[in-house]
Amino acid sequence: VVPSEERIGSVVLLLADGSVDGAPSFEARTVLNGVARVSDVSAADLDGDGDLDLAVAMFGLYKTGGALWLERRPDGRYKRHVIVQRNGVSHVPVADFDGDGRTDVLVLISQEHEELLLLVGRGRGRFEPYPLFAGPHPMFGLSGCEVCDLDGDGDLDVLFANGDALDQDPHPKPWHGAHWLENRTEPGGRPQFTHHELVRFPGAYSAVPGDLDGDGDLDVVVTSMLNRWDQPDRQSLIWLENAGVGAFVPHPVDTAPASLVCAEVDDLDGDGRAAVLAGGLHLMPPVHALGRVPAWFQRAPSGPR
């Protein structure tokens, strides 16, 4: 968990090779080793040759880190290509953001950089960088991003959170929250994104999309990692109702468990309604309201409670 300059990062493929006693069995194959701490891996055809390559994020600490892609060769080996040489890279989701049929790479760079960078695929493994968003100061706290069509207009937007404060002053900040980068790029054109702040929410560590009220559009769940032990009424989970035309209305969900760092939205019990599954990470003492993998199920059609 603790960031480090050590080159202890690796990428391991788990290849299905049958089953043992009825359970799936996998062969572990290391395709990258001896790099800065790996924080994310995404698979896609990045060079247009028909097979799956890998985009890799390496967080490192202050001097190490970056992003690269691993080109799958015909012999099954992987060739590395460096695409970002900066510390603090935490996420590398892949998608076609400009509608040209080629895969692009979104790079979230935290630490002192606080930037979202889009690497637009130009074919044959070539990428052109376009800055999409830059935080106003080095303590902005970028902590996670998701790719989704939040406004339902047929292209892919970016949903992101800034609630990381695991630095010299590990407390919730008033500028933490959830944000939406609205994709306004013309097909095949230069990337154009408009920034919208959705909500201020201290400690907002992740923001994930899902249709929570069953009305057919995407709402947003936001978790907080930094609940204060001396403020037990502070929310650790909220949801933002999509009210249309770019408006989102915040609703409280729960104050406990505290210190939630991730969430997923899905129908967990098969009742046709979305539920929320979250993950807790209790790092900052005094820890309270513990809960590693809590879930919230709907009992009414108006969102999780």
Show the residue positions of the predicted features.
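Beta-propeller-forming repeat regions
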Residues: 1-305
